[in-house]
Structure formats: C-alpha cells, structure tokens
C-alpha cells in the first residue's frame, strides 16, 4: 500500500502561513509520527445572496480511500473513485427559515443510497437556530435518511449565519448605515457561544 501524495495538506508556498497573531504564534501542528494516509474526507460549503434577496447555502462532501477495496454493489473501488459524494442546497430567508431544500447522492456505497434524497425537503419550514441538530435529525435522520447528508447540515448552518449576517453588515457598511447598536446587537446574539464572545472577553 502506498500513500497517495494528494492527501498531503495544501499549504501555500511560504515559510509561515499568514496569521494576525504575531510572528511568535504557532501556525503548524506538532511533528507527526511515521504514518500512512488511509482516508480523506473533503467538505466544501458556500453561501450565496440571491437576486431575490434569499440566500442559497450549498455543500459538497466526498470520501476517498487510499487503497482498492471490494464492493458488492460497485465492484472494485479504487482511490480515484469517491466512496461517498453528496451535494445539497438549502434556500433561506432573512429569518433563517428554509424555503427550499434539495440533495443529490452522486456516489454511495449501496444501490439504495439515493433513496435518502427524497426526505430532504422535510427541512422546508425549519428555522436554523437553537436545537438545529435535533430538528435536522428528526426531519431527515434515521432509517429513511443518509448519515453523511445529515452531518453536512451542521456546517451548513454555520455558513448560513456567516453568509446572512456578513452580507447584511456589508450592505450597511456600504450604505453608511452600520451603527454601534448594530454591532452590539450582533454580539449579543452570540454571547458566550465561544471564547471570543464570552462575557468576560477582552475583545470589543
């Protein structure tokens, strides 16, 4: 078995990756022990503001092994073939309520896998917010859904917040209407959600 060189992290050609934390800030993990890559998962998420004022959030997931393995459904699966390949899109309004949802299983390990796509529109009407993972699991998880598509809805929710609030702030900056009250309101919504938004954080 050989290690696929494409599994190596894609680091920019520079001695130290850029960081705002100063020259002494550590930007790489500790040296790895001798090892061999065996599995690679890639997740790509993107947020879009639409011409009609809604937002599309899209996600793509792929899994690859570094070695050949047998599949009763697919025959021999080689490293260049995805074990899993799923794409999805949700459309939300400014209140983070899902207006449209679709998913496609491009590649899966079993013939029945695409059947899970049929339950994805159960997400329509749900609001991204507290309890999101629980609501997703109830709507599309379990025996009628797909584990990997369900997992994707975690980062999708994060991108929805990043796209929606980032775009609203950008529009206000461009129009000169962004106020300190807006900034404080945004911060209060995220209070104590992480170290940066902790009540005792020194960051403004």
Q: Language-model segments: which ranges?
A:
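Globin-like tetrapyrrole-binding proteins
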Residues: 1-13, 186-188, 198-202
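Short, Gly/Pro- and small/polar-rich lid/capping loops
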Residues: 8-69
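Active-site- and interface-proximal helix/loop "cap" or "latch" segments in soluble metabolic
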Residues: 47-49, 61-204
């Amino acid at each position: 078995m050989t290690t696929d060189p494409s599994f190596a992290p894609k680091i920019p050609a520079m001695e130290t990756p850029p960081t705002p934390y100063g020259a002494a800030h550590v930007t790489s993990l500790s040296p790895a022990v001798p090892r061999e890559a065996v599995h690679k998962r890639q997740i790509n998420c993107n947020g879009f503001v639409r011409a009609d004022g809604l937002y599309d959030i899209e996600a793509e997931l792929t899994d690859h092994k570094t070695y050949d393995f047998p599949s009763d459904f697919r025959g021999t699966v080689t490293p260049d073939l995805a074990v899993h390949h799923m794409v999805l899109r949700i459309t939300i309004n400014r209140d983070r309520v899902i207006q449209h949802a679709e998913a496609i299983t491009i590649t899966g390990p079993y013939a029945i896998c695409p059947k899970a796509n049929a339950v994805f529109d159960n997400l329509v009407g749900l609001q991204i917010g507290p309890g999101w993972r629980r609501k997703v699991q109830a709507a599309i998880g379990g025996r009628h859904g797909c584990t990997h598509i369900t997992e994707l809805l975690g980062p999708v929710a994060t991108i929805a917040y990043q796209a929606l609030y980032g775009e609203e702030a950008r529009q206000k900056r461009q129009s000169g209407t962004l106020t300190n009250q807006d900034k404080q309101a945004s911060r209060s919504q995220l209070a104590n959600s992480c170290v940066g938004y902790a009540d005792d954080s020194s960051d403004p």
